[in-house]
Amino acid sequence: TRTLEHYFQWLMNAVADAEGGHIQPVLGLGLETALTERISPTLQGFRGMGPVRIGNQAHEHFQHDTYGNIILGAAPAFFDHRLPMNTGRTAFEQLEPLGEQAWELHDEPDAGIWELRSRARIHTSSSLMCWAACDRLGKIARHLKLDDRAALWAERAEVIRDKILDNAWSEDRGAFVESFGGSTLDASVLLMGEVGFLPPKDPRFIATVERLSEVLGRGPFMLRYEEADDFGVPEVGFNVCAFWRIDALARIGREEEARKLFEELLEARNHLGLMSEDTAFATGEGWGNFPQTYSMVGIINGAMRLSRRWEAEL
């Protein structure tokens, strides 16, 4: 529980430092905000395929999913009685400015979860996380018996939900798509199941899982999206997307298929069990940042999702 306490405190410190509720999408471990990106003049990069970048330009971006991610991370502290923390009304009120930001920005263009540098759209995954911010604030308020606040946040969540359903579903693609009114597919919409936006058996969610698997799946691996980005058409699988797919398949009742993909995906780890950010389809070679937190969290979440209850083995 100590790790959870420290994590919650780090989140709340980030919230306390925010100006007007705005939080940049990436911070240093010590909450540093200036993460100026530069290219190393001496490092050649993996197999000479530079450039090697130091810092992260994303600190300048506007990514509206940030607010939902922080509130999702903080919400369990209000309900988990193992954590001896003061997570009452004061902490809730500290989170509300983030909810206000999510509400104001839920249908505004941003750089999206993938930190795209060259275009801004109303990304479905960003709107989804804005919905999650309002939804969880409503649940926290109800838990704290703050009836007026609970009603307000629940109403806002419902408004955002309706906009996503109206604008992100594509009849032509038979799936939820990357952005409002768009037509391209993006693996991040699979998070709809994980955050509880739609019931797993909703036909639209099932159709989305199947369509994304068909178009973006490459064996056990998965592309982030099908459209060219700042660096061209994606050529390798982004590992956390493959774990999102596994989670979604398990949720819609295809556990054995999910388990098979999970076991195949684990073969991409190194001899220490660590996993990179990306994997080359043909060779299984790790690319990108290493080790990658997203990938390692994907392993943990996937194992928990697919674990059989011990009673089933008796």
Regions found by a protein language model. Give the residues of each.
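Short acidic, glycine/Ser/Thr-rich loop/turn "cap" segments at secondary-structure junctions
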Residues: G50-H59, A77-M85, I113-S118
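Aromatic-lined, polymer-binding surfaces characteristic
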Residues: G88-A151, L185-A187
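Extended glycan-interaction surfaces of carbohydrate-active proteins
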Residues: G21-H61, G73, A91, P97-P109, ...
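Alpha-helical positions within canonical tetratricopeptide repeat
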Residues: R2-H6, T90, Q94, R149-L152, ...
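Membrane helical hairpin/interfacial module
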Residues: T1-L31
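Well-ordered alpha-helical scaffold segments within catalytic/enzyme domains
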Residues: T1-R2, N69-M85, M129-L146, L190-K201, ...
